[in-house]
Amino acid sequence: MYTELISHKIAELKKERKAVILAHNYQLGEIQEAADFVGDSLELARKAANIDAEVIVFCGVHFMAETAAILSPEKTVLAPEPKAGCPMADMISGAELREFKARYPGLPVVCYVNSTAEVKAESDICCTSANAVKVVESLKSDTVLFVPDQYLGAFVQAHTAKKIISWPGYCPCHARIKPEDILNLKKHYPKAKVVVHPESRPEVTALADGVLSTGQMVTYAARADVKELIVGTEIGMLYRLRKENPNKLFIPVSEQAVCANMKMTTLPKLLASLENMQTVVSVPEEIRRKAVGAVERMLKVT
């Protein structure tokens, strides 16, 4: 009853504020239910760029709301939980990227969207896990600097003839997934397919039937030949997969694959965000102008 009351208030305020709620696939189920659109980073970036709304309420982590603010400076972007950060995004700063570039002068920088606006501003083009290979292939250079995720960089390296020089960042959540997690589950579910996120270690991706972004996992799970699926990503993903495929079995590869930051946004916080129009996420115009080029170039590639 309490949840229904809050959800009703959120729906009313959303209309009043001319707001749209975007939520990442890793968000709590109650947040996914309240959202107008649930998706992966690429899908959410596209929505933020084209959505017809005065206010975007972004239920995810800080860099996602920042990306929306970069793409839609005329809109008000709200983060219901401003403390929801991303450990991987914090593994490289703008200054560190400038030093990295100085060591390899002239090489283009591909920046994973899981990064700060300052880092995007120092990059040539952004990518997501859904389009990283395509983005790298779009560049003329035979050698590319890739930040901040070394494991996504390794995945791209396995699918391109170009040389990838990666920054040594990683997602702690996906790094917790081990090969033995998959091997043990395959003993219990021998007919199950295995999908993992490309932020996973190479020894994990080597065991998968598909190495996919969360949006691509949604498509894969809907296939008629998939009855049982071992899912190697943050466990919030299973809520959507089970909801959209109620007659299929979804098994998390590891109960340890939890992103605490993704779980910080709750219905009461979402309601408070709309009531008080907080917390507004903005990017200094000098940084935004430089960063928007990298994000828009990515969207043109895909």
From Swiss-Prot:
Gene3D superfamilies reported in the protein's UniProt record: NadA-like (3.40.50.10800)
Keyword Lyase part of the UniProt annotation: no
Signal peptide: none
Compartment(s) where it occurs, according to its Swiss-Prot or TrEMBL record: Cytoplasm
Domain of life assignment: Bacteria
Cofactor mode of binding and number, as noted: Binds 1 [4Fe-4S] cluster per subunit.
BP-aspect Gene Ontology terms: 'de novo' NAD biosynthetic process from L-aspartate
UniProt: iminosuccinate binding residues: H24, S41, Y112, V113, N114, S129, H197, P198, E199, T214
GO-annotated molecular function: 4 iron, 4 sulfur cluster binding; metal ion binding; quinolinate synthetase A activity
Main localization of the protein described in the UniProt heading: cytoplasm
Record-level GO cellular component terms: cytoplasm
E.C. number: 2.5.1.72
Described purpose of this protein according to its UniProt entry: Catalyzes the condensation of iminoaspartate with dihydroxyacetone phosphate to form quinolinate.
PANTHER family noted in UniProt: QUINOLINATE SYNTHASE, CHLOROPLASTIC (PTHR30573:SF0), QUINOLINATE SYNTHETASE A (PTHR30573)
Protein name: Quinolinate synthase
